[in-house]
């Protein structure tokens, strides 16, 4: 068996075209969806991520504002900027790029973002809405993973899904979204004694721990759908995921590549959340 790849780049292009069309409709009502991105410090990776987000907004017809501050910015100053953006009617989504400098409490900053502008889906109000199945912003990476399943016509209902990782950003919300889709969900993590025992029974495996080759071919049920959220570097400095792609692709039914899988979907779902925030203004 040779797995079929779920092309995140192609799906992302399709969804961004939809975002652009819906944004054009909003502009006819005098509303341009607006995203504010705040970057504090000079983290090189964060600078790349932020540039990609701003470019994606521009390419899809969304308004974006990038506010880049020095690492010496105080927490009080950052909170004041977030509060000002909360009150700005031209801004429908606010994203504070993580990580923040160590003297700034990231949790406090995120909780200061107005829930109706929390397009990253990290606010406790968003997490609570997800938990109880109420409308709210879904964290972008898990949201993108669900869109990938949808794109191949895969219904998680009645399937056994294993999520490897329990972060607030990916693992936990991923498990909740799969539960909402009526999958039976197992969450595995660093204290799980026999990971393979669980993954071999899974129809869907989502790997999201940031560790190379955490999932190998002998750990995968034939025909399973494998979603690789990991972003790592191999011994040659080449981008790779959490999954041993070459081996697992011989066993799985579907698999997401790295790069070109989940990565582009994360930014696309950020655009989608920002668009949906603006659409709420026109009903």
From Swiss-Prot:
E.C. number(s) listed in UniProt: 1.5.1.5, 3.5.4.9
GO CC entries: cytosol
SUPFAM superfamilies registered for this protein in UniProt: Aminoacid dehydrogenase-like, N-terminal domain, NAD(P)-binding Rossmann-fold domains
Pathway in which the depicted protein is active: One-carbon metabolism; tetrahydrofolate interconversion
Pfam name, any one: THF_DHG_CYH
Keyword Plastid attached: no
Record keywords, A-Z: Amino-acid biosynthesis, Histidine biosynthesis, Hydrolase, Methionine biosynthesis, Multifunctional enzyme, NADP, One-carbon metabolism, Oxidoreductase, Purine biosynthesis
Binding site for NADP(+): 165-167, 190
Catalytic reaction list: (6R)-5,10-methylene-5,6,7,8-tetrahydrofolate + NADP(+) = (6R)-5,10-methenyltetrahydrofolate + NADPH; (6R)-5,10-methenyltetrahydrofolate + H2O = (6R)-10-formyltetrahydrofolate + H(+)
GO molecular function, one term: methylenetetrahydrofolate dehydrogenase (NADP+) activity
Top-level taxonomic group: Bacteria
Subunit structure: Homodimer.
Official protein name in the record: Bifunctional protein FolD
Gene name of this polypeptide: folD
